[in-house]
Amino acid sequence: MTPAALVALALTLGVEVPMVAAFARLARWVGPPGAVAGAVGVNVVTHPVLYAVSTGFGSPWQLVMAEAVVVAVETVLLVWWWHVRAREDTVTLALAVVAANAASTALGLLVL
């Protein structure tokens, strides 16, 4: 992993982990260690792939579509990891993941 990729991963973790972990705790799906582990785990899976493919993007729409795929993958993984069962909870989790990814993407575009 390049130094730039590590900086981008650190930024992503710094923004998304507190948001998603806090949400999981407030929803009472998991305790603090599980909330942090899940939030870190999904980002360690998705971020390197997104970072690698995004270097070749020529359009902002490519980034938007790639982020949509990341949100879907992270939501599915967190639903499984945290044993989220209710459909409404799954939708709510997806919205939290959208918010976290939007925040980290916006910050990344501003500072990197």
Language model segments and positions:
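Juxtamembrane/disordered regions of integral membrane proteins
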Residues: 1-112
